[in-house]
Amino acid sequence: MNRTQKKTLVLLLGILVGLGILLAVVSAVVMAADCVARLVLPERSAVPCYAPVGCLALVFAMWGGARESRGLWDTFRMAATDDEPPYLVTETEKGACKQAGSVPGFYTTALRENTAAVWQNALMPVVLMASIVFAGLSSLGQERGDDFLLNWSAILGAGTTFALPLCWGMPFSRLARHFHKAGCAVAGWCGAEKISRRRAMILTDGDLFPPGTIQLNGVKVFGEDLSRVSSYAASMARAADCGLQRLFDGLLRSEGGHYEKVDDFSFYEEGGYSATIRGESVLLGTASFMRKMEVRLPGGINLRTGIFLAMDRQLAAVFAVKYQPSENVDFALRMMRRSRITPILASRDPNITPALLKRKFHKGVKVEFPSLTDRVAFSEAELDRGMPRALLFREGLLPYAEAVVGSRRLCKAVRRATALSVLGSVAGTLLSFYMVFQGAYNLLTPLALLVFLLLWALPVLLLADWAGRY
């Protein structure tokens, strides 16, 4: 970032923090005025001032602003690692999608207002006006005008909940630090909400079986030259742009072959591809695909993940392909299942099906397996470049899953914490009004009010800790 961008960022952070502590500042000023009133107004009720409550409210407000600033610091520090990160995560109609990396748009998205700030800005004038009205009713309305500042400070202090300034800053800073360690960065509330809204992730061949996990255990040729067979298979895999491309490319290089021109390429729902190479009809796919295409297979071949090549409806080669599960992928799939994030399988490899995933990974893995047309369209979405809601700086499924799952946890924690904070503010305002109206100052002591506000802040702190445990 240049100097102008840094100054703009500092100014925006100052505005956000200022809005967050404004109600606490007003509350502290009113309580300070009540301290003066106790000295100069002889008719004021002889009860302690609520100044400690106002001081602690300022502490919590500044703590929340500091945690938010720390979260943005970790996020932007990670985003500044590379001007062109390997991948970004954006939203689609079906769910989160990983695409080629791009930074522009990430910073402005990260600085958009979060839901806690929206509620805080909406609640601040309501609580302030309600406290003035209630203070007037409980003092001037009962001919106790000298108690106006006392009642106002009590009602406003109870309505200025300690929890609301922490609703966003605490979980966000915790998740931002966690994301930094995982090699990703999420663009604040807006980015987290966008990529986790659908509770789904589009996964391709490379996400489930990264390079090195698909191996060739052997090749059997039927009346053809191995170099020609490898050229045809590699050309078909490259045209399909599937996970087998790297495997057959290695075979092609070892056999000294070359890529052929592929015409009339088509995908088949049955698990294979067809094309025309040098005027020959070429098929590449699974054993079941070959049978449906009326290609005769020899007996005794029992390869659950074998790939078969046929030329002019005659079997030319059989490739024994082995899929080695990755521990990181298995961990990511378990994490997604625990958080109820649905994987959408956008595979082009005919072997990568829900049945294969259950054999290779834990049996509880559940994926959405759309039609062939949708799978191809979803996999092509990776070639687009949408708005960066999150940035990924490491390869593999795990950082991708961390970003989406963590974003969902973050949004849930912030929504729940905000709801509890608003409820606590409303409850505190009404209860304190009732007590001061009845003159029950012996129940509404500064210590009792502090305990009340701290108890409402405790669930928010627990939710912030919960957000980072997944």
List where the protein language model places each region:
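Conserved ATP-binding TGD loop and adjacent catalytic N/P-domain core of P-type ATPases
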Residues: 93, 277-279, 311-446
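Bateman (tandem CBS) regulatory domains
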Residues: 154, 213-217, 229-235, 314-317, ...
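A short acidic/small-residue loop/turn micro-motif
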Residues: 217-221, 323-325
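ATP-binding catalytic core of ATPases
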Residues: 99-121, 220-270
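Asp-based phosphoryl-transfer active-site loop
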Residues: 193-218
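Signature of the cytosolic headpiece of P-type E1-E2 ATPases
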Residues: 8-14, 253-355
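Hydrophobic alpha-helical transmembrane segments
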Residues: 6-200, 348, 391-470
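Short, positively charged
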Residues: 173-190, 249-256, 280-290
